Amino acid sequence: MGRAARWFKGMFGTKKSKDRSHVSGGDSVKGGDHSGDFNVPRDSVLLGTILTDTEKDQNKNAIAVATATATAADAAVSAAVVRLTSEGRAGDIIITKEERWAAVKIQKVFRGSLARKALRALKGIVKLQALVRGYLVRKRAAAMLQSIQTLIRVQTAMRSKRINRSLNKEYNNMFQPRQSFDKFDEATFDDRRTKIVEKDDRYMRRSSSRSRSRQVHNVVSMSDYEGDFVYKGNDLELCFSDEKWKFATAQNTPRLLHHHSANNRYYVMQSPAKSVGGKALCDYESSVSTPGYMEKTKSFKAKVRSHSAPRQRSERQRLSLDEVMASKSSVSGVSMSHQHPPRHSCSCDPL
């Protein structure tokens, strides 16, 4: 009987304790492996401790029930054996094989029922452990998902910031050249406007100078100076007689004569015979505006000179300072109408 009790204890007690210790050790190892990766909350830890305590209590109860049933079976078997032996001694009763087989069957059924009870208890414990482990695993998975979501949110925020920065840079790069072009256009417009204003000023100056030169030319052509007018380079000599500012006619209109030399070209204005004294004037405007191929030839000049009356000289008279300055200002107004006038000179051609 003692052997049977020890066998039951070894069958249901020690093996169960070893298996449970092995299972709990494996769980602890697994938990240790994952403890660095995930932090289990306090609620799950408390729940795990409570479940382990309940499991331990249930295991103890199952072991106690198994040991009690085993001891009861051993006691019953031992009582039956003692009874049989006592009866055999008393009445010399012989135990047959059938009775032995019947006793073995009874023990087998009893032990089977005890084993089924212990198996049911173990199944309940295993189911409870599976539920606890599933709860813990789900808790860890939820924590992992939350951490991944936070990480993804941070990454998306950083990416959005980078994209916004890149877009702002591209936008600025797109609009900077436009601003520069606008500035360039404004600058060019200002330059053009200043150039146009300068051109207008030059045109006005030229038009005014041309009008002045025309007025001077008309006055010179319609007036008859008393004396000779000689112009060569920057030298100016004016000689007038008493008779001044006569109207031009067919007989007293001055004629233009040309004298060529090696260095200078002379233009001579010659008066007709009716004039009192020799008169000459340098028609600067006509000399500048008239090209060379339109000038009068020597033969034409000779014909004109032959048809004209002989020239009479009069007494020369020096002009006053005011008259000289007025004539000089009129000549300078004529010369301002041209930027680079050629150098001409005029001299009187006495006859």
UniProtKB/Swiss-Prot annotation:
Q: Which family does it belong to?
A: Belongs to the IQD family.
Return the Low complexity bias intervals. Answer: 324-337
Where is the stretch described as Calmodulin-binding? 98-114
What is its quaternary makeup?
Binds to multiple calmodulin (CaM) in the presence of Ca(2+) and CaM-like proteins.
Enumerate the GO terms in the molecular function aspect. Answer: calmodulin binding
For this UniProt record, the keywords arranged alphabetically read as follows: Calmodulin-binding, Cytoplasm, Cytoskeleton, Nucleus, Repeat
Give the domain of life: Eukaryota
Query: Cellular location of this protein?
Result: Nucleus; Nucleus envelope; Cytoplasm, Cytoskeleton
Q: Which SMART domains match?
A: IQ
Source organism per entry reads Arabidopsis thaliana
Question: What does the protein in this record do?
Answer: May be involved in cooperative interactions with calmodulins or calmodulin-like proteins. Recruits calmodulin proteins to microtubules, thus being a potential scaffold in cellular signaling and trafficking. May associate with nucleic acids and regulate gene expression at the transcriptional or post-transcriptional level.
Chain ranges of the IQ domain: 99-127, 128-150
What are the top taxonomic ranks of the organism?
Eukaryota, Viridiplantae, Streptophyta, Embryophyta, Tracheophyta
Q: Which residue ranges have biased composition labelled Basic residues?
A: 299-310
Where in this protein would one find the motif Nuclear localization signal, according to its record?
Answer: 191-198
InterPro entries tied to this protein? DUF4005 (IPR025064), IQ_motif_EF-hand-BS (IPR000048), P-loop_NTPase (IPR027417)
Protein name, per record: Protein IQ-DOMAIN 27
Q: What is its main location?
A: nucleus
Composition-biased stretches (Basic and acidic residues) = 312-321
Q: Where is this region: Disordered?
A: 15-37, 299-351
Q: Name one GO cellular component term.
A: nuclear envelope
